[in-house]
Regions:
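Short, flexible coil/turn micro-motifs enriched in small/turn-prone residues
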Residues: 10-11, 207
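Acidic, Ser/Thr-rich low-complexity intrinsically disordered segments
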Residues: 177-220
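Iron-sulfur cluster-binding cysteine motifs and their immediate structural context
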Residues: 203-204, 209-258
């Protein structure tokens, strides 16, 4: 099958998913000897337009896992803004070393419904957005190289495949997970459900330079750029503002949220999960 271009798209508030999207784009580009365009689907302005992909393009797409599924506030954007035309796709999710649960299956279902042909998939354990104590060094250089090699092999198989065989392989391709399963319920240190849906970041005004970086990084556009201590919009707890503030001025102090973070650190810092690779070929 002839592929004329590669598109690599990612939702990545804290950067781990983006690293894998770029590594796999490079591997596929080398295998197919064609250009790869890497683009973000993270910020509101990057999700405004509907994106169409043709049958002679390869799409690589990745998202982090939130509570065992795709981020619930971003799921409608994936469903409504991505359109394929029998477009082959390599999909992946990242997760913070607890479990990717049903996120990979959900992403595959969305893409298949929207006209894509899923051919390969992966799940990557990354540094947890909530804590530097969970997989702080991941993705490691060797893991990105491994992902690049995976994409290269998938692209080579795609190049050699007959279109009819390709479509049949895609229809038979499955990944672990249940798209109908509910979201994971976060737990606190005591094992009880931790309810922090309404938690929002606070600002240490003694550190804040009013540079606006936190507002610029927010994937929901929820932080007031004129007064960054004001968060009138929805917070998805992605930590983009916390990690994007070089002064360390953004933080969370919600008791239930912090209890959940401690539970994760106590139970999921080790052992580190292995990355998962799956292929239809």
């Amino acid at each position: 099958m002839q592929i004329r271009g590669i598109q690599s798209l990612y939702f990545s508030p804290t950067g781990g998913t983006a690293k894998y999207a770029k590594a796999m784009a490079a591997g596929a580009a080398e295998a197919l000897a064609c250009p790869a365009e890497v683009s973000s689907f993270t910020l509101p302005r990057e999700r405004e337009e509907e994106r169409h992909f043709s049958s002679d393009e390869l799409l690589i797409i990745g998202s982090p896992t939130y509570a065992g599924k795709l981020p619930n506030k971003i799921l409608p954007e994936f469903q409504e803004k991505l359109r394929g035309e029998h477009t082959p796709v390599l999909l992946f999710v990242s997760y913070g070393n607890r479990n990717f649960d049903n996120s990979l299956a959900e992403l595959l279902s969305v893409l298949r419904t929207n006209g894509f042909l899923p051919l390969a998939a992966a799940a990557f354990a990354c540094r947890h957005a909530f804590s530097d104590r969970i997989c702080p060094e991941r993705p490691r250089v060797e893991e990105l190289a491994e992902a690049r090699g995976f994409a290269m092999r998938a692209a080579e198989a795609l190049k050699a495949a007959d279109p009819a065989v390709l479509e049949a392989a895609s229809l038979a391709f499955t990944v672990p997970g249940d798209t109908e399963a509910p979201y994971y319920v976060p737990k606190g240190e005591d094992g009880a459900p931790a309810k922090f849906l309404k938690a929002k970041p606070l600002t240490d005004l003694s550190k804040c330079l009013h540079c606006g970086a936190c507002a610029a990084h927010c994937p929901m556009g929820s932080i007031d750029a004129a007064d960054t201590s004001n968060v009138p919009g929805i917070c998805i707890k992605c930590q983009a503002c916390v990690r994007g503030c070089k002064q360390g001025a953004k933080y969370f102090e919600d008791a239930a949220f912090l209890s959940h973070v401690r539970m994760l650190e106590q139970n999921f810092a080790a052992p580190e999960k292995e990355n998962l690779y799956l292929s239809a070929f």
